[in-house]
UniProtKB/Swiss-Prot annotation:
Protein name stated in the entry: Uncharacterized RNA methyltransferase DIP1398
Biological source species: Corynebacterium diphtheriae (strain ATCC 700971 / NCTC 13129 / Biotype gravis)
Entry keyword Ribonucleoprotein: no
Residues annotated as binding S-adenosyl-L-methionine: 245, 280, 304, 349
GO biological process: rRNA base methylation
Sequence similarity: Belongs to the class I-like SAM-binding methyltransferase superfamily. RNA M5U methyltransferase family.
Keywords: Methyltransferase, S-adenosyl-L-methionine, Transferase
GO molecular function: rRNA (uridine-C5-)-methyltransferase activity
Domain TRAM: 7-65
Residues annotated as catalytic: 376 (nucleophile)
Gene3D superfamilies for the chain: Nucleic acid-binding proteins, Vaccinia Virus protein VP39
EC number: 2.1.1.-
Length: 420
């Protein structure tokens, strides 16, 4: 260990050049043998970094000042982020190459964590405008009752300036000049949604108490508290606080990918005995795509632990439920799998933490011919893919969606097939 390394401690400021990108919106620098992960830094930045955490072989830092910006860095396109909100950490990134940049990070995670030495060609899907794409936002409320985004790595509320992600009209009268906006209960949260029918809903909620998972909706400020979302011509009516894809075009794009990929396979049994699993399936927004990919043969078992989502799915897909083409199970994936008939096809869309090795192993050992795995975190997606590989599956297709432009996040979808 060098003398310089011994002197690095929390609060130290060092000058570095960012050499590579790291998962999670970080840049990588080297400083006297240590790897330095700098939050919000882009390859090519020369900057002063404020050390926040120190380990033997690496340290973490934030940007103190940028001495020479990377060619990738442009003017911040989000006023909220420019004022300290944590919404658009990639708001300064060149949007023309943002999707490819994220795809390269996915490939790096697949190689390093997923042990995929020869990944398939990675398709990149960008949805056009880098702003005005988000249909739902969760806002904090400050002591004066003003709504706004949360500051980066903080619960402090940045009010008065709207985030550029919101679709047209989403935050009108909610976030903006003080004299023109509604006031809310201090300490509450505000959920604002503009649904697929163009209707805006605004609800005030109280965060869930410590140890509880479900928040309480305390006041409907605008609309009915319900939102209507459309996929494959089916309208799902959900609580405003329920889960739905953030990007206005994402849900349909993912359903189209499922239909395309499963439709291209040669399925060994396409009679009425075909079984598909739709795991972490929400309201069943992908179930119609799965069925249409196999010409409506067989049955889709949709597993979801949230009762409100299951109820919404049963209402929206009532005819298919009545015909027993779609069967909903209000249960966790881990508990439901032992009760389901063996699948031919599987779709799984786990939360950000991933499905995990034990769950992937159980799905793989249930004997599907193919699976479509969806992930919103490159690292956990890669770890799940590694477990698929250990259980005899190969990653055949890969598609990265820049579904969260202006942020370091992306959505990744992979097609896995059983090795011969």
């Amino acid at each position: 260990m060098t003398k310089d390394q011994q002197n690095i401690e929390r609060g130290s400021v060092i000058n570095v050049e960012i050499l590579n990108a790291a998962h999670g919106g970080q840049g990588i620098a080297k400083y006297d043998g240590r790897v330095i992960f700098v939050k919000g830094a882009f390859p090519g930045d020369r900057l002063s970094a404020n050390i926040t955490h120190v380990k033997k072989k690496f340290a973490r830092a934030t940007i103190a000042s940028i001495e020479m910006p990377s060619p990738l860095r442009m003017q911040q396109r989000c006023l909220a982020a420019a004022n300290g909100a944590g919404c658009c950490d990639f708001g300064e990134f060149d949007p023309e190459i943002e999707g490819r940049y994220k795809a390269d990070l996915v490939l790096e995670q697949l190689e390093r964590l997923g042990k995929v030495s020869q990944p398939p060609t990675c398709e990149v899907v960008s949805f056009g405008s880098p702003t005005q794409w988000r249909t739902r936002m969760r806002l904090g409320v400050d002591a004066q009752g003003r709504a706004g985004g949360f500051a980066s790595q903080s619960r402090e509320v940045v009010s008065g300036v709207p985030c550029s992600q919101g679709v047209m009209g989403l935050l009108d009268g909610i976030v903006g000049a003080e004299q023109n906006v509604l006031r809310f209960t201090p300490g509450s949260q505000v959920v604002v949604v503009c649904d697929d029918l163009g209707q805006r809903t605004v609800v005030e909620t109280q965060p869930a108490p410590r140890g509880k998972r479900t928040e309480s909706m305390v006041k409907v400020v605008e609309g009915t508290g319900k939102v209507s979302q459309v996929v494959d011509g089916v309208t799902f009516e959900l609580p405003a606080t329920g889960f739905w894809q953030s990007h206005k075009d994402a849900a349909q794009a993912y359903a189209d990918t499922i239909r395309e990929w499963f439709g291209s396979l040669i399925i060994r049994n396409t009679d009425s005995s075909l079984v598909a699993w739709d795991l972490y399936g929400g309201c069943g927004s992908f179930a119609s795509a799965i069925l249409s990919a196999v010409d409506n043969h067989g049955v889709v078992h949709c597993v979801e632990s949230a009762p409100a989502a299951v109820s919404a799915g049963k209402r929206a897909l009532s005819q298919l439920v009545e015909d027993q083409k779609i069967v909903f199970h209000t249960e966790t994936v881990e508990r439901a799998m032992n009760q389901l008939p063996a699948p031919t096809l599987v779709v799984l869309d786990p939360p950000r933490v991933g499905a995990g090795a034990e769950t992937v192993r159980a799905i793989a050992q249930s004997g599907p011919q193919a699976a479509i795995h969806i992930g919103c975190d490159p690292a956990t997606f890669a770890r799940d893919i590694a477990e698929w590989s250990r259980n005899g599956f190969i990653l055949e297709k890969l598609r990265v969606f820049d579904a969260f432009p202006g942020t370091h996040h992306c959505e990744t979808i992979g097609l896995l097939t059983k090795k011969n």
